[in-house]
Curated annotation (Swiss-Prot):
Pathway: Cofactor biosynthesis; pyridoxal 5'-phosphate biosynthesis. Belongs to the glutaminase PdxT/SNO family. Disulfide bonds: none annotated. One of its GO terms (biological process) is pyridoxal phosphate biosynthetic process. The gene is pdxT. The keyword Lyase applies. It catalyses: aldehydo-D-ribose 5-phosphate + D-glyceraldehyde 3-phosphate + L-glutamine = pyridoxal 5'-phosphate + L-glutamate + phosphate + 3 H2O + H(+); L-glutamine + H2O = L-glutamate + NH4(+). GO terms for molecular function: glutaminase activity; pyridoxal 5'-phosphate synthase (glutamine hydrolysing) activity. This is Pyridoxal 5'-phosphate synthase subunit PdxT. L-glutamine binds at G49, E50, S51, R110, I139, R140.
Amino acid sequence: MTAPVIGVLALQGDVREHTAALAAAGADARPVRRPGELDLVDGLVIPGGESTTISRLADVFELREPIDKRIADGMPVYGSCAGMIMLASEVLDGRPDQRAFAGIEMTVRRNAFGRQVHSFEAPVSVAGIDGGPFHVLFIRAPWVERVGQGVEVLGTVTEGPAAGRIVAVRQGNLLATSFHPELTGDRRLHAYFADLVRAAV
């Protein structure tokens, strides 16, 4: 089976962790910092970090238009935490100068789960992925307030004060989670995305 070539947007955030998780899931993972590097990948991960910084650096490194075009052309993209914000068609509590790639028809609330001191772990079941719930980590994470037609809700928080909040979605070849699977050692979500990329090539 051919390894899909998956880039990790290497402007800020958990680049090394996503790269290692993708490699463990059987992908040929490589950092993407320039448009020429984006041209060489079959799929892209937008990691956690700070969404306003990622937005600004996407412009500085001249990646915004190439990424927008690849998304429009059907390239699979997975965004975790800040990456989810970068894929949202509408962002609540974002900065006025913040611009997303807007691939998924959803409204997300930035930093919905609170500041870093309010970060927490919780079990989340993700539809289509076997093996039981993920034990996931939320760090200043967004949640999804609304999804449009064609957006599949894959996971919600199952317990605690945030129970019922949407934290994993998919629309076509685009996948987004509020949480950080790259930090937990559970590679199932990266394997799921690698399969999605493999099927799209």
